[in-house]
């Protein structure tokens, strides 16, 4: 691990806004960005495409080690794009079903082990903003600033509904709330790397906060610690 490159971790449940905040923070600082959830979504998506059983740990571990993936950085006019085996799968990975598959494979110890070093390889100068569910507890336990971002299940479902409304047929607020609660249950109860705040994490409830308010609070913590120089 490159100790010269500081890491800020942002963990939290599905729909808490951690991906949005991490992206904005990385852009503001000019740092690298790790969307760890995308790696699990990629693996689950690739497994389904290759006919790999989502409960077969050894096959998933092998697939994880050889994922042909590229992350194309965001630009002023375009968001980050994710290329799997030569195809742009960015939009496919946002599908709720892919998210459910990702949660399933993320509970497997062999899969998490296979992706651990791949995630740590993102730590490069000038620094890294890493978002996920175990960034501060497992992947980067020595990070100088750890954020645990949450929001009520109802608010997270509402945010997701607004994102999907008009884009996905048949989406309902009640079904999204059920999915989020089920996802929370899987993520917090899994035996390996369960979703929980690191002991030294700063916990932020974004239920009644705007994106900019959350970002400003994190920037204040960065300034206090003089992390970004």
From Swiss-Prot:
<keyword id="KW-0963">Cytoplasm</keyword>
<feature type="binding site">
    <location>
        <begin position="12"/>
        <end position="20"/>
    </location>
    <ligand>
        <name>ATP</name>
    </ligand>
</feature>
<dbReference type="GO" id="GO:0036430">
    <property type="term" value="F:CMP kinase activity"/>
</dbReference>
<dbReference type="GO" id="GO:0005829">
    <property type="term" value="C:cytosol"/>
</dbReference>
<dbReference type="InterPro" id="IPR011994">
    <property type="entry name" value="Cytidylate_kinase_dom"/>
</dbReference>
<keyword id="KW-0067">ATP-binding</keyword>
<dbReference type="GO" id="GO:0036431">
    <property type="term" value="F:dCMP kinase activity"/>
</dbReference>
<dbReference type="GO" id="GO:0005524">
    <property type="term" value="F:ATP binding"/>
</dbReference>
<dbReference type="Pfam" id="PF02224">
    <property type="entry name" value="Cytidylate_kin"/>
</dbReference>
<dbReference type="GO" id="GO:0015949">
    <property type="term" value="P:nucleobase-containing small molecule interconversion"/>
</dbReference>
<keyword id="KW-0418">Kinase</keyword>
<dbReference type="InterPro" id="IPR003136">
    <property type="entry name" value="Cytidylate_kin"/>
</dbReference>
<dbReference type="InterPro" id="IPR027417">
    <property type="entry name" value="P-loop_NTPase"/>
</dbReference>
<keyword id="KW-0547">Nucleotide-binding</keyword>
<protein>
    <recommendedName>
        <fullName>Cytidylate kinase</fullName>
        <ecNumber>2.7.4.25</ecNumber>
    </recommendedName>
</protein>
<comment type="similarity">
    <text>Belongs to the cytidylate kinase family. Type 1 subfamily.</text>
</comment>
<keyword id="KW-0808">Transferase</keyword>
<dbReference type="GO" id="GO:0006220">
    <property type="term" value="P:pyrimidine nucleotide metabolic process"/>
</dbReference>
